[in-house]
Amino acid sequence: MTNLNIWYGSNENAEFSNLAKRRFFHDGYTYETVEHAYQTLKSGEFDARTYYRPWAPGRKFIGKRADRNTNIALMEKLITKSFMQNTHALNMLTDIHPSIKITHNQDRGIWRTEFPRILEELRASS
């Protein structure tokens, strides 16, 4: 089985990364990247300090502590919205053959498995 690893920092399929520019709208706010939205919202409350940082593709600012009861579902929602509102990116994702496994090898936390799972589920359902 062939793998498609996603990691912005090494430019491995960076267009699918949570740090890639895919501007989207969620709950009254516009976000530059999925990471922008996630860091702003992961605590369960809107974090204005994080939202108004100088976000750009590849940039990451750490927001408040994540609510571990909701953070994975939040990431699922944000990734889905970002692709649905950026159809070119969605088409690129769905063009990846189903036999190709999406990976996120450099990550050492929950996103090593959760991030590829979310993308693979979105790819399969779109």
What are these regions (language model features)?
Residues 1-126:
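Charged, low-complexity intrinsically disordered segments
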